[in-house]
Swiss-Prot record:
UniProt xrefs under HAMAP family: ProA
Entry keyword Cytoplasm: yes
Native species: Salmonella typhi
Pathway(s) annotated for this protein in UniProt: Amino-acid biosynthesis; L-proline biosynthesis; L-glutamate 5-semialdehyde from L-glutamate: step 2/2
Organism ancestry: Bacteria, Pseudomonadati, Pseudomonadota, Gammaproteobacteria, Enterobacterales
Annotated protein name in UniProt: Gamma-glutamyl phosphate reductase
Gene behind this protein: proA
CDD domains in alphabetical order: ALDH_F18-19_ProA-GPR
PROSITE patterns: PROA (PS01223)
């Protein structure tokens, strides 16, 4: 089954690579229209997925990840339309020039070909990835989690209907709808057909892909994000940033999970933090210093060492008091995932040092980690957030779904 999907996807990718930007935008507009027109069927499938997930005991954080509402689905359709407004990188000439030999050389962006994406309980990923791949002239094979297999299947049918209406192969966007986990291992070995693989899920999925894939893999999306409250931080705006970074949407990978507090500001800052977190419904997981310093009003539990390496994806926040900037940077290097980290400070020397020494895909000064997002960065919908350093890093927009080829123009030109 998968080999036939790969053959069809590869054939579709050749046709997609020839489309003009206008033709690709026409497809995307049709997809957005169909998502709204077929909203009832998608939401009906999603309700079944959510009910099944709840019966299986999934956490509220996970249920929020997989749930769709009319407003969320409308926002997804609007995101597709926003992709239409983005510049198409395919075909762009990056650089080039006339060589001494008389050969005119240029380096041109081209589609990757076929992209494979393995993801878990986020049904919006189906549309986000499909729209970005189509915009850049790539075909895509999707393998969503079993928790959302009905939603994903319904969504892909809508996308394929739009492709067919635009006289394009339905195989340009395909989904593996069989929940059999052994198919993931089979997909990881489809290097004959898939040019790049992107896993979006937990640490276990990323480890599996790194160890078993014969396809180049872009890993990321695991966000143990930190905020360091420096000794010079202005407490009022610092609290506002922390509330945003923790509570705006706790189930996302750019949510702060650990707060590092400079010991020189801890006595003044921690009581204010506790009051604010109590109002926001956040449970604090405190180290020994925090446990001794606070006695309410926020719910406070003792921090377990293993929690420093975990994504809560819920209204829980680690709070650790550090001796100085060195301690904060060392902590992030040991426990961070190179996703998004921030410093809150009024000392620009410390800010510059933090930016230079924290090796994450996104580093912020006096701002929320929640900004690490393709839309917020002006990239449109993102296919993933890469925490590795090769090919792509940070939110992966359109350019990350292209490679380049060298093209030489001559006039009977030969090498001397």
């Amino acid at each position: 089954m998968l080999e036939q999907m790969g053959i069809a996807a590869k054939a579709a990718s050749y046709k997609l690579a020839l489309l003009s930007s206008c033709e690709k935008n026409r497809v995307l507009e049709k997809i957005a229209d169909e998502l709204e027109a077929q909203m009832e069927s998608i939401l009906s499938a999603n309700v079944q997925d959510v009910e099944q997930a709840r019966a299986n005991g999934l956490s509220e954080a996970m249920l929020d990840r997989l749930a769709l509402t009319p407003a969320r689905l409308k926002a997804i359709a609007d995101d597709v339309r926003q992709v239409c407004n983005l510049a198409d990188p395919a075909g762009q000439v990056i650089d080039g020039g006339l060589l001494d030999s008389g050969l005119r050389l240029e380096r041109r962006r081209v589609p990757l070909g076929v992209v494979g994406v393995i993801y878990e309980a986020r049904p919006n990923v189906t549309v986000d990835v499909a729209s970005l791949c189509l915009k850049t002239g790539n075909a895509v094979i999707l393998r969503g989690g079993k928790e959302t297999h009905r939603t994903n299947a319904a969504t892909v049918l809508v996308i394929q209907k739009a492709l067919k209406a635009c006289d394009l192969p339905e195989a340009a966007v395909q989904a593996i709808d069989n929940p059999d986990r052994s198919l993931v291992s089979e997909m990881l070995r489809m290097d004959k057909y898939i040019d790049m693989l992107i896993p979006r899920g937990g640490a276990g999925l990323h480890k599996l892909c790194r160890e078993q894939s014969t396809i180049p893999v872009i890993t990321g999306g695991i966000g143990v994000c930190h905020i360091f409250v420096d000794s010079s931080a202005d407490i009022a705006p610092a609290l506002k940033i922390i509330v945003n970074a923790k509570t705006q949407r706790p189930s996302t990978c750019n949510t702060v999970e650990t707060l590092l507090v400079h010991q020189d500001i801890a006595e003044r800052f921690l009581p204010a933090l506790s009051k604010q977190m109590a109002e926001s419904g956040v449970t604090l997981h405190g180290d020994e210093t925090v446990m001794q310093a606070l006695h309410g009003p926020a719910k406070l539990v003792a921090l377990k060492p293993e929690e420093l390496d975990n994504e809560f994806l819920s209204l829980d926040l680690n709070v650790v008091v550090v001796e100085n900037m060195d301690g904060a940077i060392a902590h992030i290097r040991e426990h961070g995932t190179q996703h998004s980290d921030a410093i809150l400070t009024c000392d620009m020397h410390n800010a510059a040092r933090f930016v230079n020494e924290v090796d994450s895909a996104a580093v912020y000064v006096n701002a929320s980690t929640r900004f690490t997002d393709g839309g917020q960065f002006g990239l449109g919908a993102e296919v993933a957030v890469s925490t590795q350093k090769l090919h792509a890093r940070g939110p992966m927009g359109l350019e990350a779904l292209t490679t380049y080829k060298w093209i030489g123009f001559g006039d009977g030109t030969i090498r001397a």
